Amino acid sequence: MANPKVHVRKGDLVQVITGKDAGKKGKIIEVIPAKNRVVVEKVNIVKRHSKPSKTNPQGGIIEKEAPIDASNVMIFCPKCDRPVRSGHKFLENGDKARICRKCGDVLDKDK
């Protein structure tokens, strides 16, 4: 079975809409399509106990971001200043870009 498609990409600015971190905004660090999960910067922080190793000689308790379900985040439109649903549109140069459904602004930074 093919991996399900996730509506957000690495580097997108998103807002968490449900759960303990609802309302927080952050950038997507990692997308895990096989599990339909995303890792968002400074959201869903967990504490992990790590043994001393070469990379971390001190060891101890480390705080890091844990994955959350992709359905719990929405793309944040800076022009509307709110989380929005995204649509797709072909631009004049022939590229396909994601757009804000509210204001029509292009959400892809590179397009």
UniProtKB/Swiss-Prot annotation:
Subunit structure: Part of the 50S ribosomal subunit.
Family matches, as HAMAP family: Ribosomal_uL24_B
InterPro entries xref list: KOW, Rib_uL2_dom2, Ribosomal_uL24, Ribosomal_uL24_CS, Ribosomal_uL24_KOW, Translation_prot_SH3-like_sf
rRNA-binding in keyword set: yes
Taxonomic lineage: Bacteria, Bacillati, Bacillota, Clostridia, Eubacteriales
Organism: Heliobacterium modesticaldum (strain ATCC 51547 / Ice1)
Similarity annotation: Belongs to the universal ribosomal protein uL24 family.
Alphabetic keyword roster: Ribonucleoprotein, Ribosomal protein, RNA-binding, rRNA-binding
Gene (UniProt): rplX
Protein name in UniProt: Large ribosomal subunit protein uL24
